[in-house]
A protein has these predicted regions:
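The feature captures the beta-strand-to-loop junction immediately N-terminal to the Walker
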Residues: 35-37
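ABC-family P-loop ATPase nucleotide-binding domains
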Residues: 80-135
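Conserved ABC transporter NBD signature motif
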Residues: 58-71
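ABC ATPase "signature
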Residues: 207-208
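Helix-to-loop junction immediately C-terminal to a conserved catalytic motif
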Residues: 50
């Protein structure tokens, strides 16, 4: 059974079609890149899987279940925007995640935060943008989830932060699970991908094994991406 199944998935915002007949079957024990230019439908697809949006038509199944309360217990989601409440302290965030998610590993989260010398009594609003982003990532990756949805985790960060993000993902995800990373920066994550999906105008242009795609095209996935989308 596929971990995530999308069947004839359509999402419209009024007259605008964001996703148009998406069919995907994604297996566990894979790191999959969801790539495409801005406006291709990447974030919409991730929000549908997370059930922040509902499809216009079609179906999504996660571990055989429709998105809902049960799937939120097995899906760890990192949005493309800051979700940390300014009024909370770091300790309160840890308390919240520990109470809300049964798969949250507080010891792991604290170890990762200790390496960054983060003060647990610090209010979120007093953190730098970079530190907030790292805290969000730590919270997401400290869950032993079956699915990790990472929406543009590398967007707008410097090279050192990118290295930290990639290292944190690789060292902490549940290897029996599925990692879906949306990005338009293929070059930064190509080396860790098992599969890649290209989205264009809300449609799946390509879904291939990463090694097979490199062998068939004779070039890196990043080079092929730039050719396909004329970057």
């Amino acid at each position: 059974m596929a971990e995530i199944e999308c069947r004839d998935l359509v999402k419209k915002y009024g007259a605008k079609v964001a996703l148009n007949g998406v069919n995907l079957s994604l297996e566990k024990q894979r790191i999959i890149g969801l790539a495409g230019p801005n406006g291709s439908g990447k974030t919409t697809l991730i929000k549908l899987i997370e059930r922040l949006l509902t499809p216009t038509s079609g179906e999504i199944l996660i571990h055989g279940l429709q998105p809902g309360k049960e799937t939120k217990e097995i899906v760890s989601y990192l949005p493309d925007r800051d979700f940390l409440p300014d009024w909370m302290k770091v300790k309160e965030l840890l308390d919240f995640f520990e109470a809300f998610y049964s798969d949250f590993d507080r010891v792991k989260a604290e170890n990762l935060m200790d390496k960054l010398e983060i003060d647990y009594n610090l209010n979120i609003k007093k953190m730098s943008k970079g530190t907030r982003e790292k805290v969000q990532l730590i919270l997401c990756m400290s869950r032993k989830a079956e699915v990790y949805l990472l929406d543009e985790p590398l967007a707008g960060v410097d090279p050192a932060a990118r290295d930290y993000i990639i290292h944190t993902i690789l060292e902490n995800y549940n290897e029996d699970g599925l990692v879906l990373i949306s990005t338009h920066l293929i070059t930064d994550i190509e080396s860790i991908l098992d599969e890649v999906i290209f989205l264009q105008n809300g449609k799946v242009l390509l879904h291939r094994n990463a090694d097979d795609l490199r062998a068939e095209t004779g070039r890196s996935i990043d080079d092929y991406f730039r050719e396909v989308f004329a970057c």
